[in-house]
């Protein structure tokens, strides 16, 4: 999704997304499913290639700000909790890329298809009910989280196709809060 995405990065990303959509729920719900675990591991490896080749988006900057203030918050849990609001805000900047991701997830090739697929994946893995409040995150610090996201990892915002502002980050956090 970053502006420095490349065909090679896209190739690995789309394959990783396909494997995650298909195999992650199986691996989460049955740890003995070695086929599912192998494909999740491969998807994880491909994702590492993508971060090296094409970087990542400011969603990671926002989450790192959250976990900096709340060290018990796992990075993945933070990403999950902000994912829907983040991608809803980001998607208008590159709907065709989201359509490709949705198709890789086996969903309708559209932004809505992606958002629906994201929700289905979260539900299938039992992480759709994560709450920011359970990790000590409170709305009174949303402005501080936004400032921290920009001051510590602002380079990712510069690589975004969607030019988010600190106010946009606060809005994403507000929509994600429970």
What are these regions (language model features)?
Residues 15-26, 39-42, 46, 61-68, ...:
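Alpha-helical scaffold segments in soluble metabolic enzymes
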Residues 2-3, 26-30, 46-49, 68, ...:
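General structural signal for alpha-helix termini and helix-helix connectors
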Residues 7-18, 56, 77, 92, ...:
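Alpha-helix N-cap/helix-start motif at coil-to-helix transitions, marked by capping-box chemistry
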Residues 72-134:
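Active-site pocket-lining segment
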Residues 108-178:
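C-terminal charged capping/lid subdomain of soluble metabolic enzymes
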Residues 1-54, 161:
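Carboxylate- and glycine-rich phosphate/diphosphate-binding segment that chelates Mg2+/Mn2+
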Residues 45-76, 154-156:
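Glycine-rich phosphate/pyrophosphate-binding beta-alpha loops
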